[in-house]
Amino acid sequence: MVAKKLIELGFKRNKKVKTSFAPGSKVTAEILKKTGLQDYLDQLGFNIVGIGCTTCNGSSGPLDENLAETIEKEKVFSTAVLSGNRNFQGRIHPNIRASYLASPALVVLFSIIGSIKKDLSKDSIGKDLNGNDVFFKNVWPSNNEVNTIISQFYKSCLLYTSDAADD
């Protein structure tokens, strides 16, 4: 839902940020597809690369060559913001010095910002298509928005498919 709002406001992923997305189950991937939310994630570079452990075990692929070279040459203290549980140095990539755990929605938000140095409680995350400052509160979904998605698309029948049994 954060990705949808960001796209609608005209945001793009920060070019310094490498993205990957590996939902924990086929059911989760199916729900995102049926809600249309996966389309927004795709536009920000969060295309599904696999189901389950891929990114967290270092299988997300290489960093951009120029970025990796800059990290090494200039001794950049590079960081990752991820929702997986492999948050120790070098686990998801050898060039990553620190990893911060966050909800998937915050991972998407930080992919736009491109830095962990912003204070989301007061700093603008950027400008919208009209040049207006956008803040965390402008893109974070309300309880009502979340409940609407859940009531429309989250059906118990999805939990009892053959795909769910494989998860």
Show where each model-derived region lies.
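A glycine-rich helix N-cap at a beta->alpha junction
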Residues: 38-52
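A generic secondary-structure signal for well-formed alpha-helical elements
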Residues: 3-10, 45-48, 112-120
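Metal-dependent peptidase/peptidase-like ectodomains
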Residues: 29-34, 42, 60-68
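General beta-strand structural signal in soluble alpha/beta enzymes
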Residues: 21, 48-51, 81-83
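Mobile "lid/hinge" segments at catalytic clefts and subdomain interfaces of large enzymes
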Residues: 12-14, 54-55, 59-157
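Non-catalytic terminal/interface segments that mediate subunit docking, oligomerization
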Residues: 1-32, 36
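Gly/Ser/Thr-rich beta-alpha loop segments that engage phosphate groups in nucleotides
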Residues: 26, 52-54
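Conserved small/polar residues in nucleotide/adenosyl-binding loops
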Residues: 160-167
